[in-house]
Swiss-Prot record:
Residues 864-1286 are annotated as: Interaction with RSN and localization to the Golgi and kinetochores. The gene is Clasp2. HEAT repeats lie at residues 179-214, 215-251, 256-293, 702-739, 764-801, 1046-1083, 1090-1127, 1208-1245. It comes from Mus musculus (Mouse). InterPro entries: ARM-like, ARM-type_fold, CLASP_N_dom, TOG. One of its GO terms (cellular component) is cell cortex. Changing residue 10 to S: Impairs Golgi localization. The two SXIP sequence motifs mediate interaction with MAPRE1; this is necessary for targeting to growing microtubule plus ends. Two TOG regions display structural characteristics similar to HEAT repeat domains and mediate interaction with microtubules. This is CLIP-associating protein 2.
């Protein structure tokens, strides 16, 4: 009778979760006020509300949602184009129209039909192609507030039009509508619970369109936050939208918010509203498609009743396969890396293996002879309740599931029970135990107040729960025995070292001591230790459990079963059963599984550093707040982050969590993975690097501190795979050194820097530091400057001389360091900068000397003065003769070098003695060093020639040559800059070097001393002029010596190839344009004959690039070509003029300024007649500002034309000027007046007949300007210099 009552109560309780399986749902407005029909416990089926009684459309479908006034997506699509047609003639007209629309929509005092028409006008503009204009997107951002106001309007028609307009914008613009969508979605959600059907359905339809077409991750939190709304209709719709989002979006768009999605769906499955639960279950399938691992973890974290409801829904929708299964490939690095939670039944041999009641299981094993561990990762009480629900009235008796009759992974097994349990054969054919029905009945004698069976082996304790009743332990049933000895489960030996997945006990759960082992103490079987999970080091609490059973050593694992599983099952049997043969046989079975005769030490657990070695903590003391079911519990449960698992994806998900404690746990798990030398795959590394990049800014102190510890291990294990991430790593650590951190945290940052310096190639670090030092996007604080400089200094001490490269970035960085030696705000920066210069000088003296020789004299003086002072302070010798031209080698140079190192020094002598270079590195005293430095100083001051190799460096970088630019350590190798090929350091090479240095007298070429930044724009990265202004460089554009003749054909081909990457590779194309600008000033006629047409067309095409700096640079290059080679434009004058004038309407001032400069040069480069014939039609037909630019250009052309030619062209010139004199733009009118003044200056009174159309006031004004020009009083007017020609 008791069983029948329990069954009825449980069925009544669980029926609510089984309804609405078909997915039908009422409309949002109606369901908000629906009163559920009463249910009678006696007959729950007859009284239940039918799920389809308030039918509605399926989620996300375009069908009508019922009711008068409702709109659907078909209505929206029709309304998109059902608008008045308009035409857009110019961007200015479009801007004016959008401004008017914004004005109307921003003021709710306007009539509602005007606001509705304004919204339609936006759609009209979209249909007319407004999205093709750049200005449209600028004004669209300004419309965000107006659209939000319209969506809040009290007029339903205005709201409807606003929703349609927003949907149309999303459809047309896609992800470009990200900002607008993010702003409008919260307002659209406010429409969902509106009682006016047209408003509610319009808002829902608009959200659907946005989800389908604007895939922006920032929308996900906006949707998930509404899944916990107090409004039931909003929650229902939110899960509907979430389902649509999971169907439509790509996985990469969801990855950032995977944890939020999982948590939201879990809350939805537990939602108080039945229909919201149905919608949440639908989203589970979408989640599984994107994140199978997270979906499986979510499923296993649900209570059995919710698992059953989810399973029932998935079955009804034909998606049983979407439930988690453990036979997925475990090789995937991110999705299924040996998942600890799997749901497949263990069926090694169906004829001999008995099943268990479980939602989770262990992996299937194809080898029937191997042992399989039992599973203990479920709440058996809950499982028994689920079993009672599925049994449909059958009482829970002694029984087992016929696992052999089920397919692997079949969830139908949860619904079946058998009526008896017979003997279970083991792998050697013996029957271990035979349990009868009366034994099981003991466990079913109690039900709780909610009618659920209390049959359980191990419950999942909640914080603060106490299971102190002595009878509680004694009510456990044979299910515990089923999982121990009576029902053996085979396991794969490959998973032998994995611990069982018993859910972690929480907080302060405790069971009173008297009942713990009240039955097991008289057993004749040796009792194993059961203190598993948390040692003293890892546990925060200690146990009061002092029972003798703790003194036993644990069983040695290693024979195919997890020790925690054996312990939990055998101890459960001892606790539950009376002393006798049943207990002994059950425990003996567990002992046989472990084979205690084996003395082999088990493999260490993955998280052993936390005291979690599988047999290290048998005697550990847990705290008084901790019981057998918490951290140090007898069931072997351990904290989540200490599980013996290889699921790296789970660890990474925790590291990426928004919850700080989960991030900390993830870092703990990651530390132990790394300390056990668990290497990560390429995909895992990429994801972890992204997570770590964000963690540099982690706001939680404990997480950041642990992150720094983990980072050290990460670098040590994966240093060979992290070179691509080194820039981020190094720069972020250096920035942190400048932050206000605790001393302990600062020490950890310093340790990470030390490990980084030791782990990566020195040359790579050096290049990154040089790049970071001159990065114009960074504004380092004084502390960061000190950190950078100290790191460079320390790095220089361990670098090999060949690691120091004289590249453009190095030159710029050294210049920056020299400026830091005079930092007025910090003496620490000054000292650190001085130390860096000295370290670099000592690292590679010849190369550093060459570098200083390329810098302006100001920098040379500062550096050499510093080096003199340093040597004067450190040396005890006196200054030697200036005629001793010893050059100083690097102190750390290899001792077996056979050829000398020479620096580009120039001495007061005309010849260099070979003996002067025969020295021993170790025997150089401070006097020699000082003498060497004096020679270096003189060389720098007299240095007026760069080696041809150095000169050609910015033009074409040869990797082989670049490698050779530094000092070589092999025998017979000399500094390539020392003249070359001498393998034995012979006199000819040195004489060649000396003659090279003396080939030009001091200042023989004025340009030889000028520093040109373009010469050093090599392949590392570009540097703009602002970078050089800070270093006070000479910014002339002078180039190489005139006698430098190089074949640039290959280079031009490479540049053209790079420039053809339109809208891509912005930085690389900047470099290419700078290089091209240099080439324009060289007289390489053969190159220009071959490539001019291609260069011109590419430049003109680049004027349409999306990057404004690229457009501006292209105009500057065009200007340089016009200035140096104007004759080549004869056949391309019209095209060039048109493109240059069109650039004047660019929205960026920098581009317009460059266009004005190019037009000015163009006016003086092309023949006047040709130029005027091109300009006249443009002046008459073009709009502002193109016509203004054309008039100004024509004015410049007229100034250089002869009187006869101008008289001939006057009939073509005057109509445009007369027309422009009437223009609505005052600037155009003014430009026409100046142009007429210029014409008058050339031809005089012959102009008057052509002015007959002008009114008296205009003639009067024109005469006034003409008189001013003639008297020279025009001042700054462009006609002021015309008076001499009149």
């Amino acid at each position: 009778m008791r069983r029948l009552i329990c069954k009825r109560i449980c069925d009544y309780k669980s029926f609510d979760d089984e309804e609405s399986v078909d997915g039908n749902r009422p409309s949002s407005a109606a369901s908000a006020f629906k009163v559920p029909a009463p249910k009678t416990p006696g007959n729950p089926v007859s009284s239940a509300r039918k799920p389809g009684s308030a039918g509605g459309p399926k989620v996300g479908g375009p069908s009508k949602e019922g009711g008068a006034g409702a709109v659907d997506e078909d209505d929206f699509i029709k309304a998109f184009t059902d608008v008045p047609s308009v035409q857009i003639y110019s961007s200015r007209e479009l801007e004016e129209t959008l401004n008017k629309i914004r004005e109307i929509l921003s003021d709710d005092k306007h009539d509602w039909d005007q606001r509705a028409n304004a919204l339609k006008k936006i759609r009209s503009l979209l249909v007319a192609g407004a999205a093709q204009y750049d200005c449209f997107f600028q004004h669209l951002r300004l419309l965000d507030g107006a659209l939000k106001l319209s969506a809040k309007d009290l007029r339903s028609q205005v709201v409807r039009e606003a929703c349609i307009t927003v949907a149309h914008l999303s459809t047309v613009l896609g992800n470009k509508f990200d900002h607008g969508a993010e702003a409008i979605v919260p307002t659209l959600f406010n429409l969902v619970p509106n009682s006016a059907k047209v408003m509610a359905t319009s808002g829902c339809a608009a959200i659907r369109f946005i989800i389908r077409h604007t895939h922006v991750p920032r929308l996900i939190p906006l949707i998930t936050s509404n899944c916990t709304s107090k409004s039931v209709p909003v929650r229902r719709r939110s899960f509907e939208f979430l389902d649509l989002l999971l169907q439509e979006w790509q996985t990469h768009s969801l990855e950032r918010h995977a944890a939020v999605l999982v948590e939201t769906i879990k809350k939805g499955i537990h939602d108080a509203d039945a229909e919201a639960r149905v919608e949440a279950r639908k989203t589970y399938m979408g989640l599984r498609n994107h994140f199978p691992g997270e979906a499986e973890t979510l499923y296993n974290s649900l209570e059995p009743s919710y698992q059953k409801s989810l399973q029932t829904y998935l079955k009804s929708s034909g998606s049983v396969a979407s439930l988690p299964q453990s036979d997925r490939s475990s090789s995937s690095s991110q999705e299924s890396l040996n998942r600890p939670f799997s749901s497949k039944w263990s069926t090694a041999n169906p004829s001999t293996v008995a099943g268990r009641v479980s939602v989770g299981g262990s992996k299937a094993n194809p080898l029937p002879g191997s042992l399989q561990r039992s599973r203990s990762d479920i709440d058996v009480n809950a499982a028994a309740g689920a079993k009672a629900h599925h049994a449909a009235g059958q009482a829970v008796r002694s029984g087992r599931l016929g696992a052999g009759a089920l397919n692997p992974g079949s969830y139908a097994s949860l619904e079946d029970t058998s009526d008896k349990m017979d003997g279970t054969a083991s792998d050697d054919g013996r029957v271990r135990a035979k349990l009868s029905t009366p034994l099981v009945a003991v466990g079913n004698a109690k039900t709780d107040s909610r009618g659920r069976s209390r049959t359980k082996m191990v419950s999942q304790s909640q914080p603060g729960s106490r299971s102190g009743s002595p009878g509680r332990v004694l009510t456990t049933t044979a299910l515990s025995t089923v999982s121990s000895g009576a029902q053996r489960v085979l396991v794969n030996s490959a998973s032998a070292q994995k611990r069982s997945k018993i859910p972690r006990s929480q907080g302060c759960s405790r069971e009173a001591s008297p009942s713990r082992l009240s039955v097991a103490r008289s057993s004749r079987i040796p009792r194993p230790s059961v203190s598993q999970g948390c040692s003293r080091e890892a546990s925060r609490e200690s146990s009061r459990d002092t029972s003798p059973v703790r003194s036993f050593q644990p069983l040695g694992p290693g024979y195919g079963i997890s020790q925690s599983s054996r312990l939990s099952s055998s101890v459960s049997a001892m606790r539950v059963l009376n002393t006798g043969s049943d207990v002994e046989e059950a425990v003996a079975d567990a002992l046989l599984l472990g084979d205690i005769r084996t003395k082999k030490k088990p493999a260490r657990r993955r998280y052993e550093s936390y005291g979690m070695h599988s047999d290290d903590d048998a005697n550990s003391d847990a705290s008084s707040a901790c019981s057998e079911r918490s951290y140090s519990s007898r069931n072997g449960s351990i904290p989540t982050y200490m599980r013996q698992t290889e699921d790296v994806a789970e660890v990474l998900n925790r590291c990426a969590s928004s919850n700080w404690s989960e991030r900390k746990e993830g870092l703990l798990g990651l530390q132990n993975l790394l300390k056990n030398q668990r290497t990560l795959s390429r995909i895992e590394l990429k994801r972890l690097c992204e997570i770590f990049t964000r963690m540099f800014a982690d706001p939680h102190g404990k997480v950041f501190s642990m992150f720094l510890e983990t980072l050290v291990d990460f670098i040590q294990v994966h240093k060979d795979d992290l070179q691509d991430w080194l820039f981020v790593l190094l720069t972020q650590l250096l920035k942190k050194m400048g932050a206000d951190l605790l001393g302990s945290v600062q020490a950890k940052v310093q340790k990470a820097l030390d490990i980084t310096r030791e782990s990566f190639p020195n040359d790579l670090q050096f290049n990154i530091l040089m790049r970071f030092t001159v990065d114009q996007t960074q504004t380092p604080s004084l502390k960061v400057k000190v950190a950078i400089l100290k790191y460079i200094e320390t790095l220089a001490k361990q670098m090999d001389p060949r690691d120091f490269t004289n590249s453009s970035e190095t030159r710029l960085a050294v210049s920056r360091v020299i400026t830091w030696t005079t930092e007025p705000k910090s003496s620490d920066v000054r000292k650190a900068a001085q130390s860096v210069l000295i370290s670099l000088f000592e690292l590679n003296t010849p190369e550093f000397t060459m570098l200083l020789g390329a810098l302006p004299k100001t920098f040379q003086d500062g550096a050499t003065k510093l080096l003199h002072n340093h040597l004067r302070n450190t040396g005890n010798g006196t200054q030697s003769s200036m005629g001793s031209p010893l050059t100083r080698p690097t102190p750390r140079s290899p001792a077996n070098w056979s050829s000398p190192l020479t620096s580009p020094t120039n001495t007061s002598q005309n010849t260099l003695s070979p003996s002067a270079f025969d020295y021993d590195t170790e025997n150089m005293n401070s006097e020699d060093i000082y003498s060497s430095l004096r020679g270096v100083t003189e060389a720098i001051q007299n240095f007026s020639f760069r080696s041809q190799e150095d000169m050609s460096e910015p033009v074409r970088r040869d990797p082989k040559k670049e490698d050779g630019d530094t000092i070589c350590s092999g025998p017979g190798m000399s500094d390539p800059r020392a003249g070359g090929d001498a393998a034995d350091g012979s006199q000819p090479a040195l004489d060649n070097k000396a003659s090279l240095l003396h080939s030009m007298p001091l200042h023989s070429s004025p340009r030889s001393r000028d520093y040109n930044p373009y010469n050093y724009s090599d392949s590392i990265s570009p540097f703009n002029k602002s970078a050089l202004k800070e270093a006070m460089f000479d910014d002339d554009a002078d180039q190489f010596p005139d006698d430098l003749s190089l074949d640039h054909s290959d280079l031009v081909a490479e540049l053209l190839k790079e420039l053809s990457n339109h809208n891509e590779r912005i930085e690389e194309r900047k470099i290419a344009l700078y290089e091209l600008m240099k080439l324009t000033q060289e007289e390489s006629f053969s190159v220009w004959d071959e490539h001019f047409k291609t260069i011109l067309l590419l430049l003109l095409e680049t004027l349409g690039d999306k990057e404004p700096t690229i457009r501006a640079l292209a105009l500057k290059v065009l200007k340089e070509i016009l200035r140096h080679q104007p004759a080549r434009f004869k056949n391309y004058a019209e095209l060039t003029v048109m493109k240059t004038l069109e650039a004047h309407k660019d929205p960026h001032k920098e581009v317009v300024r460059s266009a004005e400069e190019a037009a000015s040069v163009l006016a003086t480069s092309i023949s006047p007649e040709q130029c005027i014939k091109v300009l006249c039609p443009i002046i008459q037909t073009a709009d502002y500002p193109i016509n203004l630019a054309a008039i100004k250009m024509q004015t410049k052309v007229i100034e250089r034309v002869s009187k006869e030619t101008l008289n001939m062209l006057l009939p073509e010139i005057m109509p445009g000027l007369i027309q422009g004199y009437d223009n609505s733009e005052s600037s155009v009118r003014k430009a026409c007046v100046f142009c007429l003044v210029a014409v008058h200056a050339v031809i005089g009174d012959e102009l008057k007949p052509h002015l007959s159309q002008l009114t008296g006031s205009k003639m009067k004004l024109l005469n006034l300007y003409i008189k001013r020009a003639q008297t020279g009083s025009a001042g700054a007017d462009p006609t002021a210099d015309v008076s001499g020609q009149s």
